[in-house]
Every structure is written in structure tokens, then in C-alpha cells.
Amino acid sequence: MASAFSKLLTGRNASLLFTTLGTSALTTGYLLNRQKVSADAREQHKLFPPSADYPDLRKHNNCMAECLTPTIYAKLRNKMTPSGYTLDQCIQTGVDNPGHPFIKTVGMVAGDEESYEVFADLFDPVIKLRHNGYDPRLMKHPADLDASKITHGQFDERYVLSSRVRTGRSIRGLSLPPACSRAERREVENVAITALGGLKGDLAGRYYKLSEMTEQDQQRLIDDHFLFDKPVSPLLTCAGMARDWPDARGIWHNYDKTFLIWINEEDHTRVISMEKGGNMKRVFERFCRGLKEVERLIQERGWEFMWNERLGYILTCPSNLGTGLRAGVHVRIPKLSKDPRFSKILENLRLQKRGTGGVDTAAVADVYDISNIDRIGRSEVELVQIVIDGVNYLVDCEKKLERGQDIKVPPPLPQFGRK
């Protein structure tokens, strides 16, 4: 895996840095700083045994708390990634936030690509618990961005108000948001907007820096579901992802506002395709086309996305590993949402519901945000098809209830194939 330093010393950066600082000075300064951070942290830990540092998780209800044991903690506490990220930094957000009233949170984050390897003894069981039994030690993640395979992708627009597909991508060699320095965060922004400037046709657009927006402009974009919210979530702040806000954060979108990229929120980038109405097939086609083009432009400039065959695309939160994909709709289902079988129907269809404005919001006028619950172990095409088939089933149930007919709880979807 490429480290931040090795990436720094590639391509166009190398000659400038070597000329300015000299090879020896640059190398020595960087490595000594990393070594000092690691040595200081290790010496501090040696003062107390792991049992004295073990967090009190007795009242916690998140995946990390369920999987962490004193034995695992003792094994991993003094380990560090090459960038100096520790186990305690990984789990701090889950220690500070015991649980969530509506969803079971993960309770830990990665500070860099190497976190998933160095702390695999905890990450692997957390991933298996969160992702419906997917075992990263035994399984390989499939990928498929062929939108032509999608069927029945047009919803009844009397019920479905909008459609959206999003994912995240991380730039290899740079620390993830919980651990990145200001320089790394600014480099992510620079790499992304330089590449995005190469998009053409209906994907062409421009970048808007958060620091240059007025409060009114920011809030309007948030209210219209185009921009990420302000960093008020304790899950975000406790993980260190709100540091230096709004430095090097922003949104890029095409001129139609149907293809968007968030920069430096929870992940390096979030890639989004969205539009009003129920044409999920068109939304997914634009998503696939735009995502492939963004990756090509990134690679042309000497960078690449974090990926491996076990975990798929590497992102900050383990909940988004694999595809990182969430395909969702805003759907109005007043009768079905009040039916006691609603939650079981969603569970069997591998769907989850959120309020109209997302997590921690209420459903306004009986409009719910319905999306796939899985991210890894199934391809992008499979997940979008699951959402299409599932939402069509929900709409069919709503129509039956309107006519006074009974509805059935569907059988559970089969487990993803083991590969």
C-alpha cells in the first residue's frame, strides 16, 4: 500500500520538493516526525497496562462495543498504522456515543487505509456483524457498474418523488478525514477539483468552496438536499472529522445539479447522482458513467482510489465498505407506514427507512427515505436492483391498502453468494 510519504514523492511533486528542500532533509524530517509521534504514544501506553485503559462499554449498543474484548484491546492497543493512527482513535467515537435510538451504529472509524489491516482483529468482526454476515477473511467483494442490466427502473411517480444513488471514494496515499492533516485535506481537494475540471457534456460543472459561501447559500443547498449538513453530529465530531471546518471542504456539481461530488466531509469524496421523479434507471446510468469518468481522470493525474478485493472500496466508516453505495428514494406511503408489518417488510427486503431529511429526522407528510441496508458482498447493480424491486413492492402494498386489500410480508431475500 502507498503511504502518504511515498505518494508525496511521486510524479510532479518530487522534483519541486527535492529542489526546494533537498532529498535528505525532506526524507529525514518526515520520517523523524512519524517516528516521534509513534514513540511518544508507545511510551505513554507503557505507563499503564491495557486493562487500565479498557473503555467502559457496559451501557453501549454499537457494533464496536459488541465485538471489542479485553483480549483484543490488549493485543491492539499499542499498535499503530504507518501514519500513527491508534486503536483508541478508531474507537473513540463509539466510546463517546453509546448508541442510537433508531439504528445500530458501527462505533468506530478508520484513520487511513492501513487501519483495516493493522486493527483487523476488531474491524473484521465489526464488518461481519454490520454487513449481514459478510466475512472479509473468507469472502471477496464483487463489483459491477453496468447500468444496462437494471430492469423495471421507472417508479410510479404518484408515490416516488425523487431518486438518488451515492457512493464514496478515497484517494490512496492520503489519510482519511479522522486523521488527515490540513495539508492532506487540501491535497484531496486539489486532486479532486483538478480531475473534475475534465468532465464534459452533461457532467460538466463547477466547484464551490464552503469557505466562500454565505450562510444563506449553504443552508439553501442543505435544505434542497444538495449539500452535506454542518458538522453537528457527535459521531462526526468525536471522530475528529470536523477539524478546521470549513477548510478545504466544498461541493462540485454539474450545471443541472443532477451529478454532485462532496469533498472532505465524512469521506474524501462522495459521488451522487440524483433527480426529481422516479426514473432510477436513468439516475443509476448517470451515476455509473460519471463515476467511471471521475476515476479515469483521477488516474490520469497519477492517483488512484483505495480498493482491495476483500473490502471493496475503502471508506472512513466500515458501514460503507464494499460498494459504498446507497440507492434511495423519497416515497409517500401513508397507509403502509402505519401498518404494523411495515418494519418486517423492510427487513425482509433488505431495505431501511429514514425520515424525509435523513437520519434523526421525522417523516414529513408520510414521505420516507427508503434505501438499501447492505453495502458489501453484493455489486452495485445488485443493490440498485434490490432497491427497485423493493420499492415497487412497497408501492404495490400501498395501492392494495388504498383499495382495502390485504398485504403480505415477503420472504427474506437470500444471503449474498459466498465467493
From Swiss-Prot:
<keyword id="KW-0999">Mitochondrion inner membrane</keyword>
<dbReference type="InterPro" id="IPR022414">
    <property type="entry name" value="ATP-guanido_PTrfase_cat"/>
</dbReference>
<dbReference type="InterPro" id="IPR000749">
    <property type="entry name" value="ATP-guanido_PTrfase"/>
</dbReference>
<comment type="function">
    <text>Reversibly catalyzes the transfer of phosphate between ATP and various phosphogens (e.g. creatine phosphate). Creatine kinase isoenzymes play a central role in energy transduction in tissues with large, fluctuating energy demands, such as skeletal muscle, heart, brain and spermatozoa.</text>
</comment>
<feature type="modified residue" description="Phosphothreonine">
    <location>
        <position position="356"/>
    </location>
</feature>
<dbReference type="GO" id="GO:0007507">
    <property type="term" value="P:heart development"/>
</dbReference>
<dbReference type="Pfam" id="PF02807">
    <property type="entry name" value="ATP-gua_PtransN"/>
</dbReference>
<protein>
    <recommendedName>
        <fullName>Creatine kinase S-type, mitochondrial</fullName>
        <ecNumber>2.7.3.2</ecNumber>
    </recommendedName>
</protein>
<feature type="binding site">
    <location>
        <position position="369"/>
    </location>
    <ligand>
        <name>ATP</name>
    </ligand>
</feature>
<dbReference type="InterPro" id="IPR022415">
    <property type="entry name" value="ATP-guanido_PTrfase_AS"/>
</dbReference>
<keyword id="KW-0547">Nucleotide-binding</keyword>
<dbReference type="GO" id="GO:0005739">
    <property type="term" value="C:mitochondrion"/>
</dbReference>
<dbReference type="GO" id="GO:0007519">
    <property type="term" value="P:skeletal muscle tissue development"/>
</dbReference>
<feature type="binding site">
    <location>
        <begin position="162"/>
        <end position="166"/>
    </location>
    <ligand>
        <name>ATP</name>
    </ligand>
</feature>
<dbReference type="GO" id="GO:1901612">
    <property type="term" value="F:cardiolipin binding"/>
</dbReference>
<keyword id="KW-0418">Kinase</keyword>
<feature type="transit peptide" description="Mitochondrion">
    <location>
        <begin position="1"/>
        <end position="39"/>
    </location>
</feature>
<comment type="subunit">
    <text>Exists as an octamer composed of four CKMT2 homodimers.</text>
</comment>
<keyword id="KW-0809">Transit peptide</keyword>
<feature type="region of interest" description="Cardiolipin-binding">
    <location>
        <begin position="40"/>
        <end position="64"/>
    </location>
</feature>
<feature type="binding site">
    <location>
        <position position="326"/>
    </location>
    <ligand>
        <name>ATP</name>
    </ligand>
</feature>
<keyword id="KW-0808">Transferase</keyword>
<feature type="binding site">
    <location>
        <begin position="354"/>
        <end position="359"/>
    </location>
    <ligand>
        <name>ATP</name>
    </ligand>
</feature>
<feature type="binding site">
    <location>
        <position position="270"/>
    </location>
    <ligand>
        <name>ATP</name>
    </ligand>
</feature>
<dbReference type="InterPro" id="IPR022413">
    <property type="entry name" value="ATP-guanido_PTrfase_N"/>
</dbReference>
<dbReference type="GO" id="GO:0046314">
    <property type="term" value="P:phosphocreatine biosynthetic process"/>
</dbReference>
<keyword id="KW-0067">ATP-binding</keyword>
<dbReference type="InterPro" id="IPR036802">
    <property type="entry name" value="ATP-guanido_PTrfase_N_sf"/>
</dbReference>
<dbReference type="GO" id="GO:0005743">
    <property type="term" value="C:mitochondrial inner membrane"/>
</dbReference>
<feature type="domain" description="Phosphagen kinase N-terminal">
    <location>
        <begin position="46"/>
        <end position="132"/>
    </location>
</feature>
<dbReference type="GO" id="GO:0005524">
    <property type="term" value="F:ATP binding"/>
</dbReference>
<dbReference type="GO" id="GO:0004111">
    <property type="term" value="F:creatine kinase activity"/>
</dbReference>
<dbReference type="InterPro" id="IPR014746">
    <property type="entry name" value="Gln_synth/guanido_kin_cat_dom"/>
</dbReference>
<keyword id="KW-0496">Mitochondrion</keyword>
<dbReference type="Pfam" id="PF00217">
    <property type="entry name" value="ATP-gua_Ptrans"/>
</dbReference>
<feature type="binding site">
    <location>
        <position position="225"/>
    </location>
    <ligand>
        <name>ATP</name>
    </ligand>
</feature>
<keyword id="KW-0597">Phosphoprotein</keyword>
<feature type="domain" description="Phosphagen kinase C-terminal">
    <location>
        <begin position="159"/>
        <end position="401"/>
    </location>
</feature>
<feature type="modified residue" description="Phosphotyrosine">
    <location>
        <position position="255"/>
    </location>
</feature>
<keyword id="KW-0472">Membrane</keyword>
<comment type="similarity">
    <text>Belongs to the ATP:guanido phosphotransferase family.</text>
</comment>
